[in-house]
């Protein structure tokens, strides 16, 4: 009940609900086939480009920003670049659940600095594959999804559904309270292969207590540094991890009782989709904002990491 999660989407259901298996069935593909993570990333990218009135030829930067990559190299972003037929450069970024907002700042910096004119930030999250489905503390939490956002120069923007990035703020602080020790060094010590720590694991209560305070402080300071009061924020598109967590953050930031219009919830349908959650909330709950109204996209998670992006409806 406290989580707010009622359903979720996964890449493969049969493997997850098989009591003898309890992890998804995702067949390995040959090197001549597009990878599963790139495939869902391409689908999200095509949709985002269509909504922005752009084509792949307009794109000169791609950032795949998500909590886990299916391989070390070549970068999933470069695979997507080839599949789309885009130019420029592409790279992968992992800042766990904050990856999308960190990617948005990197994209905005690239556009402002002149190293790119149009950047795709793509978050293909297959969380079901790095989750321990036998662990009652986390098995119900996550879902799979892919999102994409187009970041471009104002003078090239032709979309009637655009938002201006007016301020970003990133913060990290080391903690092992959310951790996944899977990596290429695991095979160098056979005693640790496939042990519990090689999948997502968290100390939920500790995370709740420590992260909420950090998040509301960051949103308020980011707003103030941009010359805004929290009363100027029409909407909080928060990381979709836990309903109680978001309710507490929203109440602290806004300094009042709030409703779901102030801080929309999508985790009841999608569950925790890691870095993609705040982007889905933004996608689904932005249409009613009038020109000039402001909101903040904020994600937070392992690291600890927090990213907040202030946006204004054009």
Spans of model-derived segments:
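Flexible, glycine-rich active-site loops centered on histidine and acidic residues
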Residues: 114-145
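Condensing-enzyme catalytic core mediating Claisen C-C bond formation in acyl metabolism
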Residues: 1-35, 135-209, 213, 217, ...
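Claisen-condensing/thiolase-fold acyl-transfer catalytic domains that form or cleave C-C bonds
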Residues: 32, 38, 42, 68-69, ...
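Short beta-strand segments
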Residues: 65, 94, 119-125, 151, ...
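Glycine-rich beta-alpha junction loops
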Residues: 126, 154-155, 169-175, 239-242, ...
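Conserved beta-ketoacyl condensing-enzyme motif
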Residues: 9, 14-95, 225-246
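Short acidic, glycine/serine/threonine-rich loops at helix termini
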Residues: 73-76, 104-105, 130-136, 177-178, ...
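Buried hydrophobic positions in well-ordered alpha/beta secondary-structure cores of metabolic enzymes
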Residues: 48, 59-62, 103, 150, ...
């Amino acid at each position: 009940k406290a989580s707010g999660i009622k359903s979720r989407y996964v890449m493969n259901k049969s493997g997850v609900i098989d009591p003898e298996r309890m992890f998804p069935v995702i067949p390995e593909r040959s090197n001549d086939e597009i990878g599963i993570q790139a495939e869902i990333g391409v689908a999200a990218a095509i949709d985002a480009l269509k909504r922005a009135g752009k084509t792949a030829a307009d794109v000169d930067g791609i950032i795949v920003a998500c909590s886990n990559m299916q391989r070390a190299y070549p970068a999933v972003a470069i695979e997507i670049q080839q599949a789309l037929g885009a130019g420029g450069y592409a790279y992968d970024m992992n800042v766990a659940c904050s990856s999308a907002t960190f990617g948005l700042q990197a994209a905005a910096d690239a556009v402002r600095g002149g190293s790119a004119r149009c950047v795709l930030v793509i978050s293909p999250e297959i969380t079901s594959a790095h989750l321990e489905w036998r662990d009652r503390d986390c098995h119900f939490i996550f879902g799979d999804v892919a999102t994409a956002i187009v970041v471009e120069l104002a003078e090239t923007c032709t979309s009637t559904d655009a938002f201006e990035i007016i301020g970003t703020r990133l913060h990290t602080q080391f903690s092992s309270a959310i951790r996944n020790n899977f990596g290429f060094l695991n095979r160098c010590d056979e005693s640790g292969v496939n042990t519990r720590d090689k999948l997502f694991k968290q100390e939920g209560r500790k995370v709740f207590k420590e992260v909420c305070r950090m998040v509301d402080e960051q949103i308020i300071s980011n707003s103030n540094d941009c010359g805004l009061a929290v009363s100027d924020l029409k909407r909080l598109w928060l990381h979709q991890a836990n309903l109680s967590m978001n309710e507490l953050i929203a109440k602290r930031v806004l300094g009042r009782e709030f409703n779901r219009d102030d801080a929309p919830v999508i985790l009841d349908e999608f569950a925790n989709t890691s870095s993609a959650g705040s982007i889905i909330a933004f996608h689904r709950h932005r249409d009613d904002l009038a020109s000039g109204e402001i909101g903040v996209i904020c994600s937070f998670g392992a690291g600890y990491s927090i990213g907040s992006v202030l946006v204004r409806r054009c």
